[in-house]
Amino acid sequence: MKLIILGRGNAGCISAMHFAYYRKFLNTKVEIELIYDSKIKPVPTGQGTTLQFPDWLFKNFGSNYVNSFPVTQKTGIMYENWGKKHKKIFHPFPLGRYALHFSPDQFQDYVCNNLDIDFTERDENIKNYDDLDADYIIDCRGTPKSLKEYDTLTNPLNCALLANLPKKENDILWTRTTATPDGWCFYIPLPDTISIGYLFNTNVTTVEKAKSNFKKIFGVEKINHVFPFNQYLAKEMIIDNRVLLNGNKLFFLEPLEATAMGSYVKTCQHYYNYIFNGFSKENTEYEIKDWVHKIEQFILYHYAAGSAYDTKFWKKAKKLYEITSTELLDKELKIIKDMSDLDLSRTLSSSGEFALWPPFSIKQWYDEVAS
């Protein structure tokens, strides 16, 4: 059987890692080819991961990745100016566990140069799936040119300004997410620089005003990239029973909880079951859609209590949460509200009860921000 992966961005590399690992350790007989267009460059920003990701690096590269792949540890997320109760809220990861920060271009180069399981790379721009001789194709070629075959996901943001700050010695070991008058800003400490991004809505704040506020609040001198975006989910993620979508080709949501990398891994797990374990297309698509909608609803929940700023953006963001159906999250909150501290402590090492979040994480946001 032959599997072709299109694109060597984050999702393409994760897909290659996933299926190459199972080929080696479960003796899955599959030929893997990764095809990419070298003219397409990664978005120039830092990347945070969820807790599952270091384990996948270890499974593919062993402990050597710690010394040869430039990363910083991520021990949690610091929320600043969210809600009305506290100026700062730190969401810690369970003791002894951590996620990572890194640059996507360095991650992608590392995977393609060090994946210790045979696969071939080909630099080519593929126009038609029918031109590919493969039993299955995983398409990870990024943002679609048209959203005709996609549903819109609900979120108050649609643009980001990307920049860098000079590296600090002994910098923090977590991601900062700071609420601003226009939305929020991420701060990701990398080995050689600080990646910082200002997220906002162009229907509320002009790009020029956002640039001005970004520079004023965070001391940014040069803005590297203006990144407008839509938030969406494919209506059909398995096409003609053999083309499987992943990465931004499958869905896109804002990066507030750094859910992208963990979601790409989860999607690969579903596709593995579809290809090798006989899971149906209908069940596979249902599970992926359910996963993405849970992420969509919990991210939107972060805006429910507003922020330190009573601005037009935050009024609209709170209203958006109020008028949007969050049935999946509401069911989870109803259960979690009544859980004891002992019950919650038993979930600390959970890989995720509600998409990527154990009950402890959701309860913390409810108690410290939203209630």
Locate the predicted segments by residue.
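FAD/FMN-dependent oxidoreductases across multiple families
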Residues: 200-304
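Long, low-complexity C-terminal extensions of enzymes
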Residues: 277-371
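Beta1/beta-strand and adjacent pyrophosphate-binding region of the FAD-binding site
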Residues: 1-11
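Predominantly flavin-linked oxidoreductase catalytic cores and closely associated redox partners
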Residues: 110-219
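N-terminal FAD cofactor-binding segment of flavoenzymes
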Residues: 38-87
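Short, well-ordered alpha-helices that flank and scaffold nucleotide-derived cofactor binding pockets
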Residues: 17, 21-25, 113, 273
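Helix-loop-beta segment of a Rossmann-like dinucleotide-binding subdomain
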Residues: 86-108, 190-201
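Glycine-rich FAD pyrophosphate-binding loop
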Residues: 20-45
